[in-house]
Regions:
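Perimembrane helix-loop-helix junctions
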Residues: 2-3, 190-227, 253-259
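Active-site lumenal/periplasmic loops and adjacent helix-entry segments of GT-C-fold
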Residues: 9-14, 21-152, 156-157, 179-186
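Membrane-interfacial loop-to-transmembrane alpha-helix junctions, especially the N-terminal start
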Residues: 11-14, 118-121, 169-172, 218-223, ...
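Hydrophobic alpha-helical membrane-interfacial segments at the cytosolic entry of transmembrane helices
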Residues: 18, 210-237, 297-303
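Membrane-helix boundary/interfacial segments in multi-pass membrane proteins
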Residues: 62, 71, 133-146, 247-269, ...
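Membrane-interface transmembrane helices that cradle and orient dolichyl/undecaprenyl
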Residues: 152-172, 180, 205
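Membrane-interface alpha helices of multi-pass inner-membrane proteins
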Residues: 169-185, 228-232
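Hydrophobic, aromatic-rich transmembrane alpha-helices
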Residues: 229-232, 274-307
Length: 326
């Protein structure tokens, strides 16, 4: 019987304390507000909700525009807290909540793939993930860092419902999915393909004596319910986009470049987000391919990895066409 400390799972409470110890001081220094690209954009949206909760029309930019063109939930949480803490502190509190949710969601998501000890290590490593640091302190992407953990928390319920028809799992999974969509729709759109499909595949593998067709049908049912719910929750957004479709020229962005041709872009969009995980990539591909239960996850990771390389390969341009034009 193994008694080594490292052979036991790391308590989730300890991981949350580590997260708080690392990101708490950095957020207290207001680094996202002073150094990132988009943090103050989200504060600006929240400011409008704080002063005009039921009027989405914001006259302060572009001779006026509707804030329904961006999912509102993160901004509305900031607006609510701002009545007590002020806008800037409220942004930092919501961002802290998002950062604390990340290791929790990684643990819950990892548990459907691996045993408790491995899941706890995945959760701990997520605290130090370069992608999290980049999104929070450089990009200022509060909605992405809040929507992603909400969606990861929904996926284990999707697995439980698809595999065993657990009604409580259906309700919890749909609720978390709607919350994730109300924070950031694009994260949900990509996540539904790159994460939900591998989870459904795993539910089929783990079905036991159940019918594979029944598992797929239940997965489709939950996806359908969530889809209708997202349509309702984001109805103002869909109306705004249909009424005023995006017709501007694509804005050049370094993430869509060939990363191999520019060391700065390669560092910013590959080495920083992946960090030391770059060293583990060969093992990830080998082990993910060798273990049957991990193959769906490995395939989802591989597709995500290719898209994350931007214009380094022609695949993103072939799939998304104008959306990834440089």
């Amino acid at each position: 019987m193994e008694t080594s400390y490292f052979s036991r799972p790391i308590p989730l409470r300890f991981i949350i304390l580590v997260t708080l110890a690392i990101h708490g001081p950095l957020l207290a220094l207001q680094l996202p507000l002073t150094n990132s690209y988009d943090a103050n954009f989200h504060v600006f949206f929240a400011s409008h909700y704080a002063h005009h909760w039921f009027d989405p029309w914001n006259p302060k930019w572009f001779a006026g525009f509707s804030q329904t063109t961006y999912p509102p939930l993160a901004h509305q949480w900031i607006a609510l807290l701002s009545y007590v803490f002020g806008l800037h502190m409220s942004f930092l509190l919501v961002q802290l909540a998002a950062v604390l949710l990340i290791p929790i969601s990684v643990y819950k998501f990892a548990r459907i793939w691996v045993e408790e000890r491995a899941a706890s290590y995945a959760s701990l490593f997520s605290v130090f993930a370069g992608a999290v640091a980049f999104l929070v302190y450089s990009a200022g992407q509060l909605p992405t860092t809040l929507s992603a953990p909400l969606y990861l928390l929904a996926l284990p319920y999707f697995y439980d419902w698809s595999r065993s028809a657990d009604g409580k799992a259906l309700i919890k999974g749909v609720t978390l999915t709607l919350a994730a969509a109300a924070v950031h729709h694009v994260t949900l759109i990509f996540g539904s393909v790159l994460f939900a499909i591998p989870v459904l595949w795993l539910a089929i593998i783990d079905r036991g004596q159940r019918s594979a067709a029944a598992v797929v049908i239940r997965g489709i049912i939950m996806a359908g319910i969530a889809g209708v719910g997202v349509g309702i929750v984001l109805l103002p957004y869909w109306i705004a986009i249909i009424k005023h479709p995006i017709e501007q020229m694509p804005i050049p962005h370094a993430s869509r470049s060939n990363l191999l041709l520019n060391i700065t872009y390669l560092t910013n969009y590959f080495f920083v987000p992946y960090g030391v995980l770059v060293i583990a990539l060969p093992f990830v591909l080998w082990y993910g391919s060798a273990v049957k239960r991990l193959r769906p996850l490995m395939l989802g990771f591989w597709i995500t990895f290719i898209f994350g390389l931007g214009g380094t390969t022609p695949i993103p341009r072939l799939v998304f066409r104008r959306a990834v034009a440089s």
